Amino acid sequence: MKSLFYLKLLLWVVLLSLCLLMAHRKTKVADKFRALRSRIQLRFNRHIRLNDSFADDLENGLHSRNFDIISENSNDVRGGLDDVSKNEIKQIMENDNVDFDKARLLYMERKFGQNGIAPDGTPIDPKAFTFDSR
């Protein structure tokens, strides 16, 4: 009788721990389930509606939770990233060992720098005049 009580108590502790863990990592778990669902759909030849240029990006890992290309984008006429940008972002991901979001940010900051713009979006040119929002 006493061992049954401890078994039930252990079960509740494990269940509560799992619930707390799921609440803490809900976005990561949701992303994993979304990716798993996509893989299952692809495995059973279920069609995922993607713009053709986004399909290649998905296969190459050029997506994230913040840059979701799996969601409804079949009517999106934009072409996504050009091939040169994709290759540069992939190189940043591999060389700096960062995820897609960070690589995209680094790529944009470098492009800003090449065009005379600071990483925060303000012009580097000392002659430039900006209005303060105070």
UniProtKB/Swiss-Prot annotation:
Residues 1-23 form the signal peptide. The keyword Repeat does not apply. It comes from the Eukaryota. Keywords: Isopeptide bond, Phosphoprotein, Signal, Ubl conjugation. The keyword Phosphoprotein applies. There is a cross-link at residue 86 (Glycyl lysine isopeptide (Lys-Gly) (interchain with G-Cter in ubiquitin)). The modification Phosphoserine is found at residues 71, 74. Belongs to the UPF0357 family. This is UPF0357 protein YCL012C.
